[in-house]
Design a protein with these regions (language model features):
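Bacterial N-terminal signal peptides that target proteins for export
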Residues: 1-8
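Extracytoplasmic metal-acquisition and chelation regions
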Residues: 9, 16, 20-324
Length: 324
């Protein structure tokens, strides 16, 4: 993934690479000097974000369908081919797309420009509590898996991602650079407004109830932004493919019983069976609450877009933890 991060930084330095300027792989003639970019995006969440920037100005193909677990998703042969003919590929990074790393590397080796969204933000290590120390340069350079890839749970960090993507799109389509800058600035403002809205939604939760327990460690950035403490996760680490030991579960149940948690938050992209088992051990008064943390939701879910998803998650957290 280091190669892809360097590619993103080189792009922002206005160096021509792969599909930047001219007729790169998969380039499509545009109108009035603008290029109709062919953009491939890994996750449904990033797909919505990039789609907001590229609407009517490029074709955006999202590899992961709604509801797919980004930790385990693997590309098909046709999707691998789409990666290699794209003008621009947008990935999350930090090891999130581990099941498709080989296909992404192959596209980069073919000269396709691969931009890593996580390269535009300050990454946090797994297990950071509210108010905890930020990672230094040494921590950021550790092997993948140490840093948390779930950057999208913080809309302010996503605003920084949008600014970075705007620059990437402008470099790939310099004739219409101003269009990309304007679009990214407008969408960035929407995300900053969303942050204020979420803060207001969560205001009903008193400080003593700002504690999160999750199915897997997906809400570290959310906790950092909005002043929550992450008490623990049922599945260790940030990978939904991991499995807790009986001793891990017993220790977690003990901790949660002592603290008196109200809810366990489980993602919609993975089984909630373990969360339900823990809740049954804890007894009445504790519920499992489904959150959209790995994918957008389908029609009628309230999470059809990134903005809607974040609002819905905030409302569900507030409903579960708010009040006395």
């Amino acid at each position: 993934m280091r190669r892809r991060r360097v590619a993103a930084l080189v792009l922002l330095g206005s160096v021509v690479l792969g599909g930047c300027g001219g007729e790169g792989p998969g380039a499509t003639p545009g109108v009035g000097g603008c290029r109709a970019l062919e953009i491939v995006v890994t996750t449904s969440i990033l797909g919505d974000v990039v789609g907001n920037l590229a609407a009517g100005a490029g074709a955006v193909e999202v590899l992961m369908p709604v509801g797919a677990d980004p930790h385990s998703f693997q590309v098909s042969a046709s999707q691998a081919a789409a990666l290699r003919r794209a003008d621009l590929v947008v990935v999350n990074g930090l090891g999130l797309e581990k099941g498709m790393g080989g296909a992404i590397e192959a596209a980069a080796a073919d000269g396709v420009l691969v931009v890593e969204a996580a390269s535009f933000v300050e990454a946090l290590p797994f297990g950071l509590m509210a108010g905890g120390e930020r990672p230094g340069a040494e921590e950021r350079d550790r092997p993948q898996g140490t840093l948390d890839p779930h950057i999208w749970t913080d809309p302010v960090r996503m605003a920084d991602v949008v600014t970075g993507l705007g620059k990437a799109l402008a470099a790939a389509d310099p004739a219409c650079a101003e269009r990309w800058r304007e679009r990214s600035a407008n969408y960035r403002q929407e995300l900053l407004s969303l942050d204020e809205e979420i803060d207001a939604i969560l205001a009903v939760i008193p400080a003593e109830h700002r504690q999160l327990v999750t199915n897997h460690a997906a809400l570290g950035y959310f906790a950092d932004r909005y002043g929550f403490e992450v008490l623990g996760a049922i599945v260790p680490g940030g990978d939904t493919l991991a499995a807790p030991s009986p001793a891990d579960l017993a220790a977690l149940v003990q901790t949660l019983r002592r603290v008196g948690v109200r809810a366990i938050f489980a993602e919609t992209t993975a089984s909630a069976d373990l969360a339900e088992a823990v809740v049954s051990e804890l007894g009445e008064g504790v519920v499992v609450v489904a959150l959209f943390t790995g994918s957008l939701g389908g029609p009628g879910s309230g999470a059809e877009t990134y903005l809607a998803m974040q609002r819905t998650n905030a409302e569900r957290i507030a409903a579960a933890l708010g009040g006395s």
